[in-house]
C-alpha cells in the first residue's frame, strides 16, 4: 500500500511542480508540461517507491516536475534535439534523478547508484547505436530532401494528409 500511495503522491507532486514552474517562468500554466510533470513524478519515484514517506514522495515527484520543465527547454532550445513529447527529459533526465535520490530514503549507496546510472546509460547508448545502424542499413531512417519537400504522408503512405493545402 505504501508503494501505491507513494506512486500517486509523486505523480501529484510532479504535476503541481511542473505547472507552477511553467507559471513562474512564462506567466501561463502549460498543460503539456503538467502531463510531463505527472510522468516525471512517476519516473522519479520508480527506482525506490517503498522507502519514502508520502511527503517525501511528493517532494521527489516535485523535483522531477521542476527538472523535466528545464530539461525539455534545454534539449529543445539549446541542443535543438527533436523530441516533440519530451521523452528524453521525462524518462532519461528524470530517471537519473530518480535513481540518485534513492539513498536519501534508504540505505543504498550513492556510489553504487551512480555506477548503475553509468552502466545503464552506457548499455543503452551502445545498444541504441547498434539497433539504429542495423535499421538504417535495412531501411534508411533519414528522409531525403525530395521526400521531405513532397511530404512524408504522400511518399510513405501515398496520401496527402492535408490536400486542401497542396498546390
Q: What spans do the regions from the language model cover?
A:
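Hydrophobic alpha-helical transmembrane bundles of multi-pass membrane proteins
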Residues: 1-167
